[in-house]
Amino acid sequence: MERNDFDIECFPNEIITILYAFNGTGKTTLLKLIDAVSKNDAIALGSFLFKRVELIFDNGKNIAVEKNIPNDKEYNYYIDGKLSVEPEEIEKLKKGFKVTTIFANKDYNRNTSFPKKTNLYENKEELADDTFIATVNPIITLRRYILNMLNEPEQRTKIEQLKNIINENFPMTFKHLEIENNHLLAVPDPEYKEIDSSLELDVLSSGEQKLILMFYDLLFKANSNSIVLLDEPESSLHLDWQRNLLSSVMKICEDKELQVIVATHSPAIVEEYYCLQVPMISARYKK
């Protein structure tokens, strides 16, 4: 196993830090390690090959995970250099350090979740059917969740915000999102009057659905004043959407005071925010 040593420093005064590198250089693995360390996820930490991972925060707090043998499932967990950490201290740390992970492609079905509402389903059979459908296409569950939440003022405000952000990215599709009869639907633009039917979210293209789910996660899942790990958000998106993506992400982050670490290999994403990128170059390649 080749050794890769990375020292990644986030920009302290910036909302977004971009990890930019080729495929296979460990971007996704690094994000998953950060997530696992923050939660002390024993299963995940046991599955990764590493010697030491250390997270250092602006307030001086320090978390480290260390293995004597990289492929060993056993590891030592340190908080501020202290090895013998009480379970209560770890739980306190978790509550004060929230991480939301948004992974690309197949991970989306696993990571996109929706609050359970007792009045969302009329019977157990419908719940079972929808659980199966959500595994295949979470946009269907999102559609039903939105229907349930539109009557709650705070949630409706977030849904309106989701609608507005998506509409900023949708002009090239000749459609926009509207709330009609307590449904969030895709509606043809006015100049296309011959197309008078609205579209449910689940019949939109994979890229359109991906965009909606991604911004849903940022608005509804990410806790205020927390860290968001965003992995390869460019997947399935047109180049123009890739170029505009981070400006939309920044609007949400400013409102919720989030810090985002983005892993990408898309030049379209990096070109507008070149000054925020941190190249992932292994120590052995540095001169």
Regions found by a protein language model. Give the residues of each.
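Phosphate-coordinating catalytic segments in nucleotide- and nucleic-acid-processing enzymes
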Residues: 40-208, 219
